[in-house]
Amino acid sequence: MKLLILTCLVALGFARPMVEKISESEEYVNEVPEKRLKRRFPVKNEHQVEINHHLRPESEMMSLYYQPFYWSEEMRNLKMTSLPKDRRMAVLKSTVSDEVFPSLQHKSLSLPKSKVQPLSRQQILTFHTLQMVPLSHKLLTTPKREMLPIYERERLPAHKRESLLAHERESLLAHERDILVPQREMSFVPEREFLFASERVVLPEQEKEILHNDEREVLAVHKKEILPPFEKEKVLPLLQHRVVPLPQREIVPPFQRETLLPEEILPVNQWELMPEVVPFDPYPFLQPVAPFYYSTELNEKN
């Protein structure tokens, strides 16, 4: 009989912790989820129990982003064996005076939402895209050739490019462009008859006819200067040169251009070359009339 009682006691001793574990798990399931967060990990230290006792639930911890969290002197010097009387005052009471921090920090920043919502990260464009994308009002005014990359644009002079219509420019094929572009860019060279050396007749300079510019033979520079230039070979003003298209302009050799000496361009004034030296008098700057360190009465007496 005694043996039976002993075996029952031993069995109860082994079964007791298992029953406690099962009861704890049932309590864990039935508890409020805010309290369950505190008991998620097994607590082995008494200090940890007291710290968890002061922590807020997770729903209240979100207010820490808006409300500053200060430890009072009572909590700072607190021994973990004794709890403060008012737990809420111990956590929220600020050690910093209200004069240092504005009153806004002690209130929750519940500001009204702005009507204009900020752009999301996907809608915000980078600097390069903002720089490269043309604006809406520029799309209507920018020609198509300028919107193309530089290497795809036609390499034509300005007066030729404007003379071509838009549909003519687009109708040109790629191989036609390659042929036409160098022809348009070439300067105007008049056609002349090429004679062999045996067929050329060299006349003395007095008997030579004064030929046109395109019929004139190739001469040395010092012989060309002897020939009188025609009226049309005279140098036109710069504005007339620019009005005429480039192929129709006459190419004037440099020895026929009207050159001016640097002294004849503008009347040289001696003061422009070397300005007048003005003597610098530092007296009024160093010693003012009414200095600030003397009173007006002393100045009147002196």
UniProtKB/Swiss-Prot annotation:
Assigned protein family: Belongs to the beta-casein family.
Ranges of the Sequence repeats in the UniProt entry: 144-151, 152-159, 160-167, 168-175, 176-182, 183-190, 191-198, 199-204, 205-214, 215-222, 223-230, 231-238, 241-247, 248-255, 256-262, 263-269
Signal peptide as annotated in the record: 1-15
Compartment(s) where it occurs, according to its Swiss-Prot or TrEMBL record: Secreted
Function in brief: Important role in determination of the surface properties of the casein micelles.
Tissue: Mammary gland specific. Secreted in milk.
Keywords: Milk protein, Phosphoprotein, Repeat, Secreted, Signal
Keyword Signal part of the UniProt annotation: yes
Name the UniProt record assigns to this protein: Beta-casein
Induction notes from the record: Maximal induction is dependent upon prolactin and insulin.
UniProt modified residues of type Phosphoserine: S23, S25
Keyword Signal applies: yes
Superkingdom of the source species: Eukaryota
GO CC term, one of those recorded: extracellular region
